[in-house]
Each structure stands twice: as structure tokens, then as C-alpha cells.
């Protein structure tokens, strides 16, 4: 009889999880924030995949302007395996952490001034499954892949909109940064293709927005050498020698090309002390409140507090320790390059905003410019500064395929280094204004 106990417990767990599938809740209070939230927050799960086995967790925040007509934006974080809470709390959401030494209590939340929710409704989605609070009810599920996750996101959106039909008429955009540069163009294609299938709920797809996007592994990595030279991190002599000896390929070097390998060692010695996310920021002790990256630790303290999980309506027992970025998450990176998807999206007439922090060395702006030029579209608004209060905030150009490229002066790999400038950039673009 004892052999039935584990099976009975498993059955009870399955029934519990099934009961909580496709749930949603309006959250009025959050631990760490004083008083009621000054915006409308909804959290919940949407089941996708076979028998809804993948339960995708989301945070939805209504626009503070006119939620009935303002755009609906899906925002994804990078990784893969980084929770979209990263975007909500650090980059473009209405809440942020007060940066102070952690004393064992719940970190303090404060309102921000740069939230994109001032002009858009935003869904922050934890994907792929296993990221953040998203989980699978099937412990034997296949390892997620980029293309498979894109299909899951499309399914999520159509189900979410079916449960929130008041947003079907809102213009829809997909967005994200970093590794989302691989995912978002594919998701746009999945949505576009799905809209052509009779009987599927229609999504009013308009375009997409990407910050410092990972696009093509070889191109992104190789462009770091050109960027380092332009930023005076390596000498002109080393740069010219690397170009001549390595032939522009610095990633998969022929092991017989020993001269190139030696030059790459010299390059590594020059840049090893540089913080690649933002080369202006010093490398520092992550446990020090003076370190910019210290804030990422606060989200771990906050999201792993039981009162926080209860407030967010996280289903008990579905996830272990919450990690902002689950770097151990297994994922099949089967999209080598998203450039072909950008090409197809351009042909289909979707708008796009591609922007880069000009001091980001992980995915340098020079590499992003290279793949944009490879699309071979004519320029309709030539390279020029874009301004905030009569000061140069970056540079921009627009192409005939409705693609706008912009740099953010002094910006890094993620939006949190220049949140105000990124917010103004987005607000102008989403409303159809010139930058």
C-alpha cells in the first residue's frame, strides 16, 4: 500500500496545478511599497503547449494615459532565462528598488518617472518556460528552443487577448532587449503567420522595438574589435594587424593561424578589465551598494520572500528559488541569426525601432549598423542627432522599410543605464513623432 502514497501525492499536485491554471489576479498592494499601487497591476498564468502543460507567468500593467486606445506592448528580457521582472523593475516599468544596503528585510520599492506605461499597456512575460515564475506541469518536457518558444509566445498572446478582449483593437507591438533580439523578430513572424489562419484570434500587429539586440552571433562578436578600436581601447597598430592577419574573423580562428591567435591574446589583455555592459562603468564588487549591478541582487531578495510570492499569486510549489536570470536553464538556441526575419518583417511593412547604447560592448552599435545596412534599404532620414532639452541624446537615421535606428549617448547594454533617455526615445517613436 505504501507504493501508492507517492502516486497519490503526485495526483494531488497535478490537481492543484490544474486548478490554478490560467488564473489572473488584480494586485493592489506589494510588499516593500508603501500604500496602494498607483497603477493597475495584474499577474497570472496562461497555459500553452500540449494540454496547456507550460504555465507562462506574466505581469500586466495598464497604461496610465488611455488604456482603451494606447498600444499594447509585449516586453521580453534576454538571457535566455532572464525574468521579464528585470524590465519591469529596472528598465521601463513604474517601479524600482531603492538602492540601499540590504538589512534582511524586504527591499523597498519606489515609483519611477520614466515608465513606458505612461503611454502603453505592457505585458511582461517570463519566457521560455522555466524562467522566472513560469513552469511546466510536465517534468519530462522537451528542452525549450528559440523557435518553439516563439510559437509558445504567439499562443500565449492569443489566449491572453481572448481573456482580455477589450485589447483586441489596440495596436500591438513586441519588444525586448539583449537576447530578445533573436526572439522578437521570430515572434513577429509567428504572429503575422497566425493572423493569416482562419479562425485564430487576430492580433493588430504594428511592429517591434529592440534595445541593444543580439542578432547574429558571429557578427555581434566580431564587431567588438571594431568597437574597441573606435573607443581607443586598443591601438591602431593592433587593430590593423588583427584585420590583416585574422581576415575579420576573430571568433572561429583557424588553430594553425598562430599569429592571429597571439593578436587576439593581446586584444584580450587590453579589454579584460573593461565592463562590457557599459564600458564607462568600473568593474566592481556586486555586493556593494555603490556597484551598479548591486540592484540586481535586490530582486532576488524581494522575489524569494514568501509574502511577495503570496502577493503576486504565485502558485505554491511550482518554482524553487527565483533567479532573475537562470543561466543554467537548458535552451536550444536554434536561431543562428535573426536577420532573415528582419528582412521578412520589413517586406511585410512592420515598423521597427532598433536602438543601441553607444557604450555597450556586448552587442556594439557598429555591428547593429552592419546588419541593418545589409537589408539594403535606402535612407529617408539621414544620420542626425536627436535631442532632449536642446542637448544631444544620441544619433538616429530612418530607412525606407520603416526601420528607425538610434543610439543613446552614454548608454549601455540594457535600458537601466539611461532610463530617462530611453523612455523619451520610445514615447516619441510609438506616437509616430520624429525622434
From Swiss-Prot:
It holds the Pfam family Peptidase_S10. Its EC number is 3.4.16.-. GO terms for molecular function: serine-type carboxypeptidase activity. GO terms for biological process: proteolysis. It is found in: Secreted. It comes from the Eukaryota. One of its GO terms (cellular component) is extracellular region. Residues 1-23 form the signal peptide. The active site is at 178, 360, 413. Keywords: Carboxypeptidase, Disulfide bond, Glycoprotein, Hydrolase, Protease, Secreted, Signal. Expressed in seedlings, roots and leaves. The keyword Transit peptide does not apply. Glycans are attached at residues 103, 305, 376. The keyword Hydrolase applies. Disulfide bonds join 82-325, 246-260, 284-291. Probable carboxypeptidase. Belongs to the peptidase S10 family. PANTHER family: SERINE CARBOXYPEPTIDASE-LIKE 14-RELATED, SERINE PROTEASE FAMILY S10 SERINE CARBOXYPEPTIDASE. This is Serine carboxypeptidase-like 16.
Amino acid at each position: 500500500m505504501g507504493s501508492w502514497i507517492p502516486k497519490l501525492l503526485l495526483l494531488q499536485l497535478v490537481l492543484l496545478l490544474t486548478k490554478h491554471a490560467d488564473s489572473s489576479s488584480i494586485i493592489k498592494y506589494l510588499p516593500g511599497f508603501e500604500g496602494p499601487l498607483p497603477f493597475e497591476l495584474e499577474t497570472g498564468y496562461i497555459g500553452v503547449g500540449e494540454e496547456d502543460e507550460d504555465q507562462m507567468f506574466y505581469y500586466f500593467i495598464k497604461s496610465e494615459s488611455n488604456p482603451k486606445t494606447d498600444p499594447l506592448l509585449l516586453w521580453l528580457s534576454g538571457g535566455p532565462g532572464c525574468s521579464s521582472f528585470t524590465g519591469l523593475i529596472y528598465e521601463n516599468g513604474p517601479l524600482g528598488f531603492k538602492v540601499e544596503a540590504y538589512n534582511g528585510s524586504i527591499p523597498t520599492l519606489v515609483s519611477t518617472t520614466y515608465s513606458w506605461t505612461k503611454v502603453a499597456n505592457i505585458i511582461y512575460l517570463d519566457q521560455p518556460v522555466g524562467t522566472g515564475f513560469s513552469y511546466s506541469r510536465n517534468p519530462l518536457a522537451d528542452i525549450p528552443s528559440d523557435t518553439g518558444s516563439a510559437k509558445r509566445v504567439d499562443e500565449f498572446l492569443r489566449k491572453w487577448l481572448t481573456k482580455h478582449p477589450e485589447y483586441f483593437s489596440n495596436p500591438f507591438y513586441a519588444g525586448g532587449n539583449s537576447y530578445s533580439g533573436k526572439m522578437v523578430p521570430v515572434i513577429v513572424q509567428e504572429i503575422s503567420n497566425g493572423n493569416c489562419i482562419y479562425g485564430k484570434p487576430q492580433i493588430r500587429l504594428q511592429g517591434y522595438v529592440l534595445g541593444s539586440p543580439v542578432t547574429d552571433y558571429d557578427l555581434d562578436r566580431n564587431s567588438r574589435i571594431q568597437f574597441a578600436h573606435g573607443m581607443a581601447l586598443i591601438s591602431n597598430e593592433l587593430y590593423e594587424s588583427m584585420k590583416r592577419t585574422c581576415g575579420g574573423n576573430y571568433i572561429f580562428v583557424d588553430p594553425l593561424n598562430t599569429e592571429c591567435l597571439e593578436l587576439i591574446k593581446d586584444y584580450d589583455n587590453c579589454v579584460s578589465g573593461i565592463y562590457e555592459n557599459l564600458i564607462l562603468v568600473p568593474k566592481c564588487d556586486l555586493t556593494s551598494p555603490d556597484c551598479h549591478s548591486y540592484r540586481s541582487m535586490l530582486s532576488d531578495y524581494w522575489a524569494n520572500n514568501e509574502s511577495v510570492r503570496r502577493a503576486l499569486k504565485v502558485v505554491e510549489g511550482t518554482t524553487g528559488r527565483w533567479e532573475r536570470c537562470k543561466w543554467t536553464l537548458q535552451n536550444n538556441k536554434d536561431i543562428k541569426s535573426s536577420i532573415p526575419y528582419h528582412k521578412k518583417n520589413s517586406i511585410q511593412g512592420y515598423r521597427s525601432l532598433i536602438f543601441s547604447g553607444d557604450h555597450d560592448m556586448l552587442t556594439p552599435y557598429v555591428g547593429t549598423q552592419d546588419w541593418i545596412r545589409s537589408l539594403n534599404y535606402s535612407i529617408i532620414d539621414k544620420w542626425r542627432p536627436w535631442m532632449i532639452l536642446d542637448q544631444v541624446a544620441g544619433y538616429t537615421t530612418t530607412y525606407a522599410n520603416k526601420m528607425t535606428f538610434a543610439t543613446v549617448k552614454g548608454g549601455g547594454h540594457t535600458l537601466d543605464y539611461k532610463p530617462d533617455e530611453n523612455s523619451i526615445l520610445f514615447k516619441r517613436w510609438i506616437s509616430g513623432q520624429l525622434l
